[in-house]
């Protein structure tokens, strides 16, 4: 009985927090932009989990990071669709016009990010800490490189 009450209280709290976060989020006029921005928020959380796994001393920490690694790789695969031409002029984003003006350069950055995140996912699935750490560093470098070229400060 106590567990049921506790579970109900936790669920109610979680719903309240999610509802408040939803209220505080500034939505754009484009659902792709909303999806992109939400995905970036999740990417930050997943990258933090991957970083903790790479620094952990537990033997199975990398293998336990397979789920966030999968999320990062999945988001990377979705990036081209999230930066469609209909999102170019949407206000309230930090996406620079260079994304669309230099489409081949942006595509190359996305391809590097996709390759790096696929390597992180494979290394996590295999439980290979050395490959995981290397591919995570490559993923972080790809993030930074793309943000430097294609994201406004702020």
Residue ranges and their predicted role:
Residues 1-7:
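Bacterial N-terminal signal peptides that target proteins for export
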Residues 7-9, 19:
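Cleavable N-terminal signal peptides
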Residues 15, 137-140:
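Processing junctions and N-termini across compartments
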